[in-house]
Every structure is written in C-alpha cells, then in structure tokens.
Design a protein with these regions (language model features):
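Helix-terminus/linker motif at the lipid-water interface of multi-pass membrane proteins
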Residues: 30-49, 118-125, 181-192, 255-288, ...
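Small-residue-rich hydrophobic transmembrane alpha-helices
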Residues: 48-108, 145-164, 278-342, 373-387, ...
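Short runs within selected transmembrane alpha-helices of multi-pass transporters and secretion channels
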Residues: 69, 138-157, 164-172, 197-213, ...
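Transmembrane helical elements of multi-pass membrane transporters/channels
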Residues: 16-35, 137, 148, 171, ...
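Transmembrane alpha-helix boundary and packing residues in multipass membrane permease domains
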Residues: 21, 25, 37, 74, ...
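Short alpha-helical transmembrane segments in multi-pass integral membrane proteins
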Residues: 1-18, 76-143, 174, 181, ...
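N-terminal transmembrane alpha-helices
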Residues: 5-43, 56-71, 75, 100-107, ...
Length: 452
C-alpha cells in the first residue's frame, strides 16, 4: 500500500485520501444539522437554544482526544511509511487505551459539574433546565463518542479513510432514524424530548463501532481488533511520551479554541435566547466549510508523515502546494455556496424570521475568512508531520487569546452582536501571517528526521 501511495500522482493520492474524509465530515455535519432541524421544528427555538449551549462543552472534551489522535496519527503515519506494522499496532493500542480513560473521566466530571458549567456560560434562564438535562445524557455517552473519534483518526494514519466513512454512514443512518422516533414516541418508543438526539447518537455510535470491528477483522486490517491488537492495549510510556509530545500541544490548542468558543458563547448569550439559537444555526453552516478545510490540513499532515517515514523528503513541498490549491477549490467553492444558499439553509432549522435574518447577517460577516483559516491550517499540518508543533500552536493560541477575544469584546461594545463575528477574520488573518513567516524563515531550514 505504501509503495502504491508514492507511485501515484500527488493530486490523485491527495484526492483519494481526502474524498472519503470530506464526505465523512459532511455526513457528520449533516447529522448534527438534521438533528437541529428535528429539534428546532419539532420542539421549538428554545429547545434548539438549549442544545446549542452544549456545543462548546462537548468540544472541550473532544479536543483532548483530537490532540491525542493528532500525535498518534503522525507517529502511525511515519511507521506506516516505513512499513513497520508492529509499531503501528503498538502506537494505536497505547493511544486508544489512554483515550478510553479520558472518556471515562470526562463523563464523570462533566456530569457532576454540568449545571455549574452551563450557568457560568450565561445560558439563558428560560432554557437552563433543558440544557442541563441534555448535558447529563450527552456527557454519559461521551466515552463511546470519544473512542469512535479517536479510532477513526488512527485509521487515517494508515491511509484508510474509507472505513471511517462507511462506519459513519452506519452511525448517521441509525441516529437520524431514531431521533424523530424518540422525540415523538413512535413505534412504541418512549418520547424523550430534547434528550432524543443524544440517545439516538449513542445507538448510532455503538452500531458503527460493532460494524467497524467486523469489517476490519474480515479484511485483515493492520488495526483490526484481533488478539495482537488487544495485546497492544497498554500504556507504553515511551510511545505515549512521543504521542503526547506532539498531541499535547495540539490538545492544548484545541482546548484554548474551545475556551474561546465558551467566551464567544457567553457574549452571545448576553443578547438573549434568540441570539443563542442564531449562534447554533450559524455554527452548523460554518461546520460544513470548516471541517473540509481541516480535512485538507489533516491529509497534508498524514501524507507528510508517511513521506518522512519512507525517506521521501522531497515530497514535502509539493504536498503543501497541492493542499493549498485544493483549499482554494474546495473550501472556496463551499464558501460561495454558503453565501448563495444561506437564507434557505438557515431556514431549515430556524422557524422565526427575525432569528433567521440575524443568523444570515452574522454568517455573511465571517464565512469568507474560512478560506484563510484553511491556508494556515494546512501550513501548520505540514510542520506537524515532522513533529514541529509547539511554535505553530503558540501562534494559534496567541491569535485566539491575544487577538480574537479582545477584538470580540471591543467590537461587541462598538457594533453589538455582529461585532463578535467580526473578530473571527481578524484572528484568522493573524494566524496565516505568523504561520507563513515561521514556515519560511525557520521550519524550511530545519533538519527533518523520523520520530519513531
């Protein structure tokens, strides 16, 4: 598989890797969007506002696992490029076990402090009780979600983006079929109201993981849950040290982004539940553009790691340039569609005209800047492939904490709710400028070596 990867034209390798991952992100976003439509249309705007308040809280815990998976993905990519299958299993086993422990801790702590967290976020009083009820269920099913997210990241390290896509199809189909049935109590099921989407998501995740295990075993996949894989499920200090060296800064970055979203949400909540519902709707649309941009960056990082593992360092530059070009075509195209279809898209899950008009205006302010976000993410992804993460992460954190948040507060005071969204382009432009300078002036002059 490795030799075939390097024998193909780079653009073809990119697209074969990227296409299933982008489709996976679309499915994931679609699942969240359709669930929001179900809740908004069947339970009302207040219910949607209650669910929207959980987005940053769940993302806070997912950020830890995303960081862990990013570190493991680089190491697995290098080991896979060097054709060291035993090392691939060892890295995956140690990382997955740590991910399980994180999920259990997140479930306990998150459930205990759910009300305090949502109150601290300034969740509107008229939706607080519903938000807490939803949070309790969502956090208890979080371990299964985290394991699923982490395992799909590990699969990508060995260039398998098709299996995660097929598993997500299973998860999405089950979840979307169950959500309205649980909301209304169809087919003899108990009517669970606002908690329906969470329970349906749990059923979908468990179904997908069972199907994925069957598929990997049947295909003799290097990450199949067989005897050798379970033997590798141990907390190897050496491996985890290297995983955390790359993954921890990435996790910290994701947490800072999560915390920044909490601050943004707190600012939005000050404008009332209508603004909170608009925030949730805008987030859904933004996900359709931002996740594909991140997928391009992940692809660049994995392909770069495999090139390093195989000793093909001359491919690093072309991998970066191809990623930037695909970002222009794919992310840019989605941005254009977002502007053209924003009124119709937002109307899918916002029933009040005033709320939809507010959300449309906010979306138009920042949607274009996701192209800039994609550029900086791809540059950072290439550097991450070699294990260079600390400075790119610091750049991102400085731009979020030192630029975006102060700008959001100041612009909120000057322009009201729309000022909060004006801060996003400012931060993304800062990230792109600083990441590019570090790449050109420092990283390109460093010696690149395998990490494992």
């Amino acid at each position: 598989m490795q030799s075939a990867t390097f024998a193909k034209p780079l653009w073809q390798t990119y697209l074969l890797f990227l296409a299933p991952m982008v489709l996976s992100n679309f499915l994931q976003s679609m699942s969240g969007t359709v669930n929001s439509i179900y809740i908004g249309q069947m339970l009302g705007t207040q219910a949607l506002a209650a669910v929207s308040g959980m987005f940053p809280v769940v993302f806070f815990f997912i950020a830890l696992v995303i960081g862990l998976g990013a570190g493991a993905g680089v190491l697995i990519g290098q080991a896979w490029g060097a054709r060291e299958t035993h090392m691939v299993k060892a890295i995956a086993g140690a990382t997955l076990l740590l991910g399980v422990l994180i999920g259990l801790v997140a479930a306990v702590l998150g459930t205990v402090f759910a009300r305090q967290a949502l109150t601290g976020l300034g969740t509107p009083a008229d939706v607080l009780d519903d938000a807490v009820d939803y949070a309790h269920v969502m956090l208890w099913i979080l371990p299964s979600l985290l394991v699923f997210v982490l395992f799909t990241q590990l699969l990508r390290g060995v260039s398998d983006t098709l299996s995660p896509l097929l598993a997500l199809i299973v998860s999405t189909t089950v979840g979307l079929a169950l959500t309205p049935a649980l909301i209304r109590g169809w087919l003899g099921l108990p009517p669970l109201g606002i908690q329906s989407a969470a329970y349906a998501g749990l059923a979908g995740n468990l179904s997908a993981m069972a199907w994925l295990a069957w598929r990997l075993i049947r295909k003799g996949h290097p990450l199949a849950p067989d005897r050798e894989f379970f033997a590798a499920l141990r907390l190897d200090r050496v491996i985890l040290g290297k995983v955390l060296r790359i993954g921890l800064p990435t996790g910290v970055q994701m947490i800072v982004l999560s915390l920044s979203e909490l601050v943004i949400l707190a600012l939005v909540n000050q404008h009332g539940s209508q603004a909170t519902a608009a925030y949730g709707a805008v987030t859904q649309i933004v996900n359709y553009v931002q996740f594909p941009a991140l997928s391009i960056a992940i692809t660049a990082s994995i392909l770069g790691a495999q090139a390093i593992g195989a000793g093909h360092l001359q491919r690093m530059g072309p991998i970066l340039r191809t990623g930037l070009l695909i970002n222009v075509c794919l992310t840019g195209g989605l941005i254009v569609l977002g502007y053209l279809l924003s009124h119709w898209l937002l109307g899918l899950f916002l029933t009040e005209d005033s709320t939809r008009a507010m959300a449309e205006h906010l979306l138009h302010i920042m949607l274009w800047s996701l192209l800039v976000f994609g550029f900086q993410a791809i540059i950072g992804g290439i550097m991450r492939a070699s294990g260079t993460v600390l400075v790119p992460v610091v750049i991102s954190i400085v731009c979020v904490v030192g630029v975006q948040l102060p700008a959001a507060y100041w612009l909120d005071g000057q322009f009201g709710l729309q000022g909060v969204w004006m801060a996003f382009p400012v931060a993304y432009l800062g990230m792109l400028i600083l990441q590019t300078l570090y790449y050109k002036l420092v990283w390109k002059h460093q010696k690149i070596e395998r990490l494992i």
